[in-house]
Amino acid sequence: MRNLVLGVVLGLAIATASSALLAQRGGPSVAEAVTADPAHYSVSFENELVRLLRVRYGAGEKSVMHRHSASCVIFLTDQTFDFTLPDGTTEPASVPAGALGCGDGNVHLPANIGADAAEFIMVEFKNRETFQR
């Protein structure tokens, strides 16, 4: 349970830090994840309220800088990532399988630094009102 809480706290801290940087930069200027990195992000379902993404990074794979709207994540595997933020700083995060996390939109470049593939499901909310319900 301690690892689960720690993983969620780390994930939310990264989301908050990159969300603050996004606000400082005056809004999203980078492409959203599916457009920027279709090799790792695929749309499984979409309607007027949410978009459900299936995400998979092989061991050692990394993305490009991209953005997310407010979202919740369900981690399907144990995973260890480095997240590079728009200002060039890097934040490490280790999250156990089964952890859940939600956060405001963010901009980052994730890299799977773990020895195994990392998989998760992300639910992106299309507007703040839906996310805040």
Where are these regions (language model features)?
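Positively charged n-region of N-terminal signal peptides that target proteins for export
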Residues: 1-4
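A short glycine-rich, His/Asp/Glu-containing loop-to-beta-strand
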Residues: 37-64, 69-73, 123
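Ligand-binding loop in jelly-roll beta-barrel domains
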Residues: 78, 105-128
